[in-house]
Amino acid sequence: MKNNKKISSIRIATTGANGKMGKQITRTAINISKIIHTSSLVRHKSSFKNYDIGKLANIFPIGVFTNDNIKDISDKFDVLIDFTSVKSSLEYLNFCYKNKKKMVIGTTGFNAMQNKLIKHMSKKIAIFYSENFSFGANIIFRLLKNISSIGNIKNIDIDIIECHHKEKSDIPSATSILIKKNILKNLKIKKNIKISSIRSGNIIGEHKIIFSFLGEKIEITHQAYNRKIFALGAIKAAIWLSNKKTGLFNMSHILNKQAKNFKSN
């Protein structure tokens, strides 16, 4: 649904306030004028309940305190930004569905049935779901639509190597699975694409696609140097949802709009 009205301030709530992404979104949101970070959630009976989220994110106090029950903050937010676990994310989604709240989902690891559920719920509320909120990674997805045609060459091997911190639970990463799907979708011949996963240290995220020929190879690599890129993407997603009532959206919608704006200028 199109809406050309000027976007006013958007009230966001976040989940996992004491987690890596929760803290990063707090640090990032304070510098974006359209965003009002009104509330943030932690796990039920968490020791981090009633913490100032600014202090929790290692910045200055901002007067917003954590809560462990989404029902208590229902009237305080327009869009929920969630980077937690599959179980928690589905619980938050169910609440948003029942209370007609918009939701940005950054959690990964959903199975096919859960993805169908997200799509079904988007008929009633606006949902923005992406396996990766980095603009660079999403540009790679687009590049692969063209470059993957080289996979039709007879003697070629295609490999994907993904590296993440040792606490990341889903193996392989949702991004690497999406990369594989994007390549296979554009191939005219069947190809076995291998994904190798590394979980080590505090690596934020690295994805490498290798096209190996006889005597040469092509590599495409995306490296995330900090979590701010994901936080910015998620906040832009919340802004995107601000004038949407229903529908399922992803980063390609934002990239398409940016491309149109670039052409018109």
UniProtKB/Swiss-Prot annotation:
Supply the name of the protein. 4-hydroxy-tetrahydrodipicolinate reductase
Q: Where in the cell is it found?
A: Cytoplasm
Q: Which GO terms describe its molecular function?
A: 4-hydroxy-tetrahydrodipicolinate reductase; NAD binding; NADP binding; oxidoreductase activity, acting on CH or CH2 groups, NAD or NADP as acceptor
Q: Which organism is it from?
A: Wigglesworthia glossinidia brevipalpis
Q: Which InterPro entries match?
A: DapB_C, DapB_N, DapB_N_CS, DHDPR_bac, NAD(P)-bd_dom_sf
Q: Which family does it belong to?
A: Belongs to the DapB family.
SUPFAM superfamilies attached here?
Glyceraldehyde-3-phosphate dehydrogenase-like, C-terminal domain (SSF55347), NAD(P)-binding Rossmann-fold domains (SSF51735)
**The enzyme's E.C. designation:** 1.17.1.8
Task: Tell me what gene encodes this.
Answer: dapB
Please list the residues that bind NAD(+).
Answer: G16, A17, N18, G19, K20, M21, G106, T107, T108, S130, E131, N132, F133
GO BP annotation list: diaminopimelate biosynthetic process; lysine biosynthetic process via diaminopimelate
Arranged from A to Z, the UniProt key words for this protein are: Amino-acid biosynthesis, Cytoplasm, Diaminopimelate biosynthesis, Lysine biosynthesis, NAD, NADP, Oxidoreductase
> Where do the annotations place NADP(+) binding?
R43
